[in-house]
Amino acid sequence: MPELPEVETSRRGIEPHLVGATILHAHIRNGRLRWPVSDEIYRLSDTPVLSVQRRAKYLLLELPDGWIIIHLGMSGSLRILSEALPAEKHDHVDLVMSNGKILRYTDPRRFGAWLWTKELEGHNVLAHLGPEPLSDEFNGEYLQQKCAKKKTAIKPWLMDNKLVVGVGNIYASESLFAAGIHPDRLASSLSTAECDLLAQVIKAVLLRSIEQGGTTLKDFLQSDGKPGYFAQELQVYGRKGEPCRVCGTPIVATKHAQRATFYCRHCQK
């Protein structure tokens, strides 16, 4: 599933081609996504795009009368096309722009979403979200406060959007490795120093992935059709049985609640 770096990479890639241009019309080939594509999107015509923003894993296209909320789901990606290339099986939505560009949404598993809202505030998919991990609000003090009485393992807690948004399976595994924290540790067992370090490395890992265009393991592509290159820098995720890049100990993989967890027994305590 695309996580924060992949969604932010998409935002940065499409923004220059959309902001200041006008949506001439939307071409919906298959509106049966996780939720049906909103009727308002079908009716778009001569509509300027004012901004392209992100909240958590949602892309937000600001229009004069409302917002398009896009979620990439498990396998979605957005590309900017310079010409109307023939659509393939999983190309479900096109926004045809006044500058000759086309924003094309591809989603093999159709778990993504294209929604419409007049106001962002209070929308059900955006309500109850925690802070952005790259914001000043997310820091060691905040993390320690939220972990202090939490009797659950730290890894699934990091992946809870009520704690912090956008840290999914890949980046939770990578951040815990960078901080030297075992993924099964109780959140309440983390010390002040460990919370400070973990907040710092989460920011560093996410920023590095954004620099590399995100992580492509299967379906994700950047807006120019290229893969994300952070996969080449993964320390533990997807490396079961391979030697730890730090100590040489084979990487361990376990599964909890259908989620794979990767870690080094020697480096993470």
Curated annotation (Swiss-Prot):
One GO BP annotation of this record: base-excision repair
Textual note on the cofactor: Binds 1 zinc ion per subunit.
Renumbered zinc finger spans (FPG-type): 235-269
GO molecular function: 8-oxo-7,8-dihydroguanine DNA N-glycosylase activity; class I DNA-(apurinic or apyrimidinic site) endonuclease activity; damaged DNA binding; zinc ion binding
Binding, DNA: H90, R109, K150
Taxonomic superkingdom: Bacteria
Keywords: DNA damage, DNA repair, DNA-binding, Glycosidase, Hydrolase, Lyase, Metal-binding, Multifunctional enzyme, Zinc, Zinc-finger
PROSITE patterns: FPG_CAT, ZF_FPG_1, ZF_FPG_2
Active-site residue numbers: P2, E3, K57, R259
Keyword DNA-binding: yes
Catalytic reaction(s) noted: Hydrolysis of DNA containing ring-opened 7-methylguanine residues, releasing 2,6-diamino-4-hydroxy-5-(N-methyl)formamidopyrimidine; 2'-deoxyribonucleotide-(2'-deoxyribose 5'-phosphate)-2'-deoxyribonucleotide-DNA = a 3'-end 2'-deoxyribonucleotide-(2,3-dehydro-2,3-deoxyribose 5'-phosphate)-DNA + a 5'-end 5'-phospho-2'-deoxyribonucleoside-DNA + H(+)
EC assignment: 3.2.2.23, 4.2.99.18
Cofactor(s) annotated in UniProt: Zn(2+)
Pfam family, one: Fapy_DNA_glyco
Protein task: Involved in base excision repair of DNA damaged by oxidation or by mutagenic agents. Acts as a DNA glycosylase that recognizes and removes damaged bases. Has a preference for oxidized purines, such as 7,8-dihydro-8-oxoguanine (8-oxoG). Has AP (apurinic/apyrimidinic) lyase activity and introduces nicks in the DNA strand. Cleaves the DNA backbone by beta-delta elimination to generate a single-strand break at the site of the removed base with both 3'- and 5'-phosphates.
Stored NCBIfam families: fpg, PRK01103.1
Subunit text: Monomer.
Similarity remark: Belongs to the FPG family.
Name this polypeptide is given: Formamidopyrimidine-DNA glycosylase
UniProt source species: Salmonella newport (strain SL254)
Origin organism lineage: Bacteria, Pseudomonadati, Pseudomonadota, Gammaproteobacteria, Enterobacterales
Gene that specifies this protein: mutM
